[in-house]
Amino acid sequence: MSHVLILVWLLGFALVHSGLAALRPQGEKRLGARGYRLLFATASLAVAVPLLGYFWKHCYDGVQLWQVQDVPGVRAWVWGLTALSFLFLFPATFNLGEITAIQKPQIHLYSQGIIRICRHPQMVAQTLWCIAHTIWIGSSFMVVTSLGLIAYHLFGVWHGDRRWAARYPEAFPELKANTSIIPFWAIVQGKQKLVWREFLRPAYVGVAVFVIAVYWLH
């Protein structure tokens, strides 16, 4: 039953999160950019927090498909993938003032930093996180959860590109042409190159501290 319920939770989050994202242009006209961002964040968190609680409570449910936690090297690989996932995820934290609506939320179309590697870093981050935790936990519940999360983020790639194209019909096609969904593909094609100084930002220190803290808490 928990396998079905986690998919229901994920579907509910998808409807709230992606649904409100799709309604952003109309919502901002009525509530303003800050007001709608607060509504968006509050509604998303209202579903995400109990979803995470349900996941942690049931992550070992179902059939134990494999048990590799005691295999030498597995722990290091799992933590390596987890740390890498945060490096892809954290561009969303560059503008915390906007996320919390302290500053006026704005749209940022750019092809620097992690965007040179992948246009949708959050999808890559979630996929890496799912792979790492599926390897570590090894339960049928974790497999179902990971497949659901990855499927939602793949939908998010399509949905996000569609929204950007509709909102920025002139600027987005150029960004899309010069970046890639598959990590490093635009670099392989010669459309992008890594500029390491773009990664030298104070926020990365915060990510490193966060990863280390989570490691010790685990």
Predicted regions and their residues:
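Membrane-interface helix-loop junction between the first two transmembrane segments
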Residues: S18-Y36
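Alpha-helical transmembrane segments
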Residues: S2-I6, D70-F88, F141-H153
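Membrane-water interface of transmembrane alpha-helices
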Residues: V16-L20, L87-A101, D161-R167
